């Protein structure tokens, strides 16, 4: 790790020797010139990123069996133009795009919060066992509680189980992993590194439980569980999307209120304690909120890999670790990553639709590997 010296002077802004990891303004620059330029750079990056994501959303709504131009998409959003275009955009494509945006924002914010409070760049819903816990809960709903729907197709198997019950048990399984981590970490006062390792162990336990449940299931039920784990943005209805948006908004507000705590913890727990921050309370509270946000998305959309891991890393490279800007930038980047992945799902082997989790892994994993190799000397 890079040795950093933090200086705090009365009436001055916090400054560091280097910009490399924290994104704070370098020393030797005036308060107005250096700091204003530092802020302006980050705001410009976030604004450009938001415009790019908006363009991707319009492009996504124009792709499909009925190809539409950007102008046609905009007209259809306002109920004007060709009737077929209006129906396709408003009834099918817009809900899917909104789901991708909300889910991408939620997973990225959760991943950013995990990586901050645990001080571990590999912390995410997958490495903490949250995704695996959700899969275990969904398996119970589809296989045990559905009572053997006898469906002949995977998507029919998912629909034969009560979708509300499936979502509830998936959410319960995801939160069970979180509660176990929080309880065990409080009993033994685990370090952040140990908490991540505990999450990996719980992932193995939930995966084993899912395997055992599938072993005693019928073929159609196993196919239904596998189909659920693929992830699907199209199966989210309006009520579920609204709930996802509300939970995500609450999580975003909580993380925003804790942005200064995240910045202090980024410079070390010792400094955070000296500033009067209860590190353990901040860690546990934000882990719980992040898990609730991620679990809600996974419960409705299925497992979506790498979004919460890659988006914060990319934005940290561009903007540094100032969470005032890293949080919104990660949210926008996550939305863009999931939108691009959803587009690829629909165009690679059209008219077939590929699993969203596979595409996010294919897109996210190479980016993550590149970032690791690029920063290997730091």
Where on the chain are the PLM-derived regions?
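Polybasic, lysine-rich low-complexity intrinsically disordered segments
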Residues: 3-4
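Alpha-helical transmembrane segments in inner-membrane proteins
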Residues: 7-378
């Amino acid at each position: 790790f890079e040795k950093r010296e933090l200086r705090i002077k009365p009436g001055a802004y916090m400054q560091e020797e280097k910009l490399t990891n924290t994104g704070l303004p370098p020393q030797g620059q005036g308060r107005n010139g250096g700091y204003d330029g530092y802020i302006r750079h980050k705001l410009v990056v976030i604004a450009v990123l938001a415009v790019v994501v908006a363009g991707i959303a319009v492009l996504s709504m124009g792709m499909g069996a009925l190809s539409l131009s950007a102008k046609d998409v905009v007209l259809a959003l306002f109920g004007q133009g060709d009737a077929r275009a209006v129906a396709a955009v408003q009834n099918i494509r817009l809900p899917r795009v909104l789901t991708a945006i909300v889910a991408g924002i939620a997973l990225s914010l959760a991943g950013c919060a995990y990586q901050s409070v645990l001080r571990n760049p590999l912390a995410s819903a997958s490495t903490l066992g949250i995704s695996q816990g959700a899969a275990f809960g969904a398996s119970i709903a589809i296989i045990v509680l559905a009572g053997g729907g006898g469906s002949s197709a995977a998507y029919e198997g998912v629909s034969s189980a009560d979708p509300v019950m499936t979502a509830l048990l998936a959410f319960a399984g995801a939160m069970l992993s979180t509660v176990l981590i929080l309880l065990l970490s409080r009993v033994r006062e685990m370090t952040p590194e140990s908490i991540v390792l505990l999450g990996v162990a719980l992932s193995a336990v939930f995966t084993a439980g899912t395997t055992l449940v599938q072993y005693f299931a019928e073929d159609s039920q196993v196919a239904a569980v596998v189909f659920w784990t693929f992830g699907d943005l199209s199966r989210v209805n309006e009520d579920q999307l609204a709930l996802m948006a509300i939970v995500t908004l609450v999580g975003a507000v909580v993380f925003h209120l804790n942005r200064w705590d995240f910045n202090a913890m980024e410079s070390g727990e010792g400094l955070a304690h000296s500033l009067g921050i209860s590190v353990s309370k901040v860690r546990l509270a934000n882990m719980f909120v992040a898990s609730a946000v991620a679990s809600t998305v996974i419960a409705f959309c299925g497992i979506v890999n790498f979004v919460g891991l890659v988006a914060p890393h990319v934005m940290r490279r561009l903007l540094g670790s100032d969470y005032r800007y890293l949080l919104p930038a990660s949210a926008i980047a996550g939305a863009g990553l999931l939108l691009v992945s959803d587009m690829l799902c629909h165009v690679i082997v059209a008219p077939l639709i590929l699993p969203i989790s596979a595409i996010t892994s294919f897109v996210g994993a190479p980016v993550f590997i590149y970032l690791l190799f690029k920063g290997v000397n730091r």
